[in-house]
Amino acid sequence: MSTTITNSTAERKHSHVDICLNGDVAFSTPTTGFERYRLRHNALPEVSFADITTESRFLGRRIGAPLMISSMTGGYSEAAELNRQLAETAERFQLPLGVGSMRQALEDDAYRDSFSVVRRHAPTIQIFANIGAPEVAKGLSDKDLHIMLEMIRADGLIIHLNAAQELFQPEGGTDFRRVLDNIADIAAKLPVPVIAKEVGCGISGAVARKLLEAGVQVIDVAGAGGISWQKVEEARYTRRFGSDTRFSQEGIEELLNWGIPTAACVVEVDALRPRTAGGRPFSIIASGGIHSGLDIAKSIALGADLAASAGALLRALHHGTLEATITAWLQDLRASMFLTGSANVAELQNNRPIGDTAKQP
């Protein structure tokens, strides 16, 4: 692989973090949709707040809370320190952790330490490798898959589906043919689960069904309402070229805010249970605009097995408040569980919220 390509990939990874921290890249509309729902208050909770546990299970393993520190970064020099801090925090709270896209580590082994650092600092938690749909479309060799999994002793592989991001990315790859077939091939050969993840535009029930039938075991809906990766790439494009004339002025605003709200995605994907994939169980991760323990609680009550956050936790890490932020979120979650009479996460998942499209008891 040429130095020009690897250097440009590293530059892109670095600029992504910079823009997410300093740019105005949140969705204008739609919101996550969580504001449409109210958790169902229980005036007789019949549970002691002191006895409430946030512990849960994900892919057969105990986790400290139904929260994943989602895929953020890797593949450039400063990423190793960010990933070290994320890994140490995830280990402390016993939370699953996803790394950023590992494309750069496949292109240049000099960047592999920016990923492998996570396992050195988080020896006991679930850690997930990550690669994008454009690389899947081109075809990943068995060697590529082995390198990614072994690099972090991964408990699974995240495949991120990022069509809208690639559409806006200056150097984006927009040939998404063969992605589903190649996902099926990967899922069939890997010894670990495959997670299909959007990056902010959401996964509908119809698409989730196809992914599950292809052998995917976890759907991370990654809906609209948090960071718009279209806006991140638009910022990179205008930095480079000064203005964007690729789209009409009338259409670009809607394209920059394109996506299905996170809450709507969770409801649609949860509705597939248990009819999809021959009745085989699957897990749902709610991500895209998770900013509090109330968002986590609503995600679980709508049917997700856990929530995940990247942007909000990256900002907390940048400000030195990551551990305090997670602690506060988990206290929010425990308060929500107490007020709904849910002693554990499974009980919260059966406490359907009040809302226009929420399942009613």
Curated annotation (Swiss-Prot):
EC number, as in UniProt: 5.3.3.2
Catalysed conversion reaction: isopentenyl diphosphate = dimethylallyl diphosphate
Principal location listed in the UniProt entry: cytoplasm
GO cellular component: cytoplasm
Positions with a binding annotation for FMN: S70, S71, M72, T73, S101, N130, K197, A310, G311
Binding site for Mg(2+): E166
InterPro entries named among the record's database cross-references: Aldolase_TIM, FMN-dep_DH, IPdP_isomerase
Function: Involved in the biosynthesis of isoprenoids. Catalyzes the 1,3-allylic rearrangement of the homoallylic substrate isopentenyl (IPP) to its allylic isomer, dimethylallyl diphosphate (DMAPP).
Family: Belongs to the IPP isomerase type 2 family.
UniProt-recorded name of the protein: Isopentenyl-diphosphate delta-isomerase
Species the sequence originates in: Chlorobium luteolum (strain DSM 273 / BCRC 81028 / 2530) (Pelodictyon luteolum)
Classification of source organism: Bacteria, Pseudomonadati, Chlorobiota, Chlorobiia, Chlorobiales
